[in-house]
Amino acid sequence: MNWQSERIWIELITGSRKTSNFCWACILFLGSLGFLLVGTSSYLGRNLISLFPSQQILFFPQGIVMSFYGIAGLFISSYLWCTISWNVGSGYDLFDRKEGIVCIFRWGFPGINRRIFLRFLMRDIQSIRMEVKEGLYPRRVLYMEIRGQGAIPLTRTDENFTPREIEQKAAESAYFLRVPIEVF
């Protein structure tokens, strides 16, 4: 979502609260819970899941391995749920032509650096850089090249932009900031 006037441009950034992350967290949780229940039922010798008799799976080695996969999956699932609840990666980009400043804000993981806030002058922006890699897994990322600080990404690496969309976004950013576009 964007909001733009003649002098101010605010772009809201979606973090980890995406539909795909919710789906993967649910699938991983349910799958790992199933693995853990099968491993536990083979250890106890009881049917905790009524799909098949527990006597078909021996505890050693299949039950131990399934329990291990279930526990590992629950850890990964809890990590995904934590990143979703903390909304890691969300924030905004603020470009203020009137004040001549650019502010980039992102939420991180809990701790000292939970709030990531970058602020610099518009006159320090050298260019908008587009990095395009084609192939089996195409990657199109937009960077803002800043004097003395290097390149700061404006788009996520996992966003799948079409060539037309990334060009449009680069052109809008370069036009608003009045800087050139570089393509790598």
Curated annotation (Swiss-Prot):
Coiled-coil regions listed: none
Keywords linked to the UniProt accession: Chloroplast, Membrane, Photosynthesis, Plastid, Thylakoid, Transmembrane, Transmembrane helix
Membrane-spanning segments: 22-42, 57-77
Role, per record: Seems to be required for the assembly of the photosystem I complex.
Descriptive protein name: Photosystem I assembly protein Ycf4
Similarity comment: family membership: Belongs to the Ycf4 family.
Annotated localization: Plastid, Chloroplast thylakoid membrane
GO biological process, one term: photosynthesis
HAMAP family for this protein: Ycf4 (MF_00437)
Pfam family name, one: Ycf4
Membrane topology (UniProt): Multi-pass membrane protein
Keyword hit for Hydrolase: no
Species, as recorded: Liriodendron tulipifera (Tuliptree)
InterPro entries, per database record: PSI_Ycf4_assembly (IPR003359)
Chief place of localization: plastid
GO cellular component: chloroplast thylakoid membrane; photosystem I
